[in-house]
């Protein structure tokens, strides 16, 4: 049994087309729907994303993901955390790059995730394959006392700590730690290293990505 992620715009019937997709960001309900627009439009008041109705399912998903990063920054007011007029949702080039990297979650050949485990054994961000290892016991603890993991972007490794100070770390914290390190990987591979300096922003994205993907996950025998 393996965890996979379903493209919500991919119809189950070949003769049909998915015209709208609903999902949550935090406590907010958003609807992404096809419309007669040239470029993707976001209405933050009505919480509606309008996507060019000529796009296929893969392109529609790409636009949804791009909008997702923008909406997270807006709804959680992450821009206030960035100095010197930089933006938490980054510029258009970085946004496109992040969306491209994140879209790999919908290709099950780019990650190895067994059913009923907290996180995958490995995953790909662009051309870089990251492998995830559990560390049984360490004396290291972050200053926040919440995240228990570390990323090595040169070797493509993520270490998740299982025990600290002789106490088991709960599954929920290990899961959050993985997504936290995953967001670090996204920012690094998108050449947006400065975003890694603000742990609150990384954690905010990590939480929302985890919830976003959870809404579109399924399981297959593989």
Language-model segments: residues:
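Basic/hydrophobic alpha-helical interface regions
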Residues: 2-3
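Long, highly charged low-complexity segments enriched in Glu/Asp and Lys/Arg with interspersed Ser/Thr
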Residues: 104-105, 214-219
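Active-site scaffold of zinc-dependent metalloenzymes
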Residues: 9-62, 74-91, 109-172, 188-189, ...
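Active-site recognition of the HExxH zinc-binding catalytic motif
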Residues: 62-75, 176-188
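Long, well-structured alpha-helical subdomains associated
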Residues: 109-110, 219-222
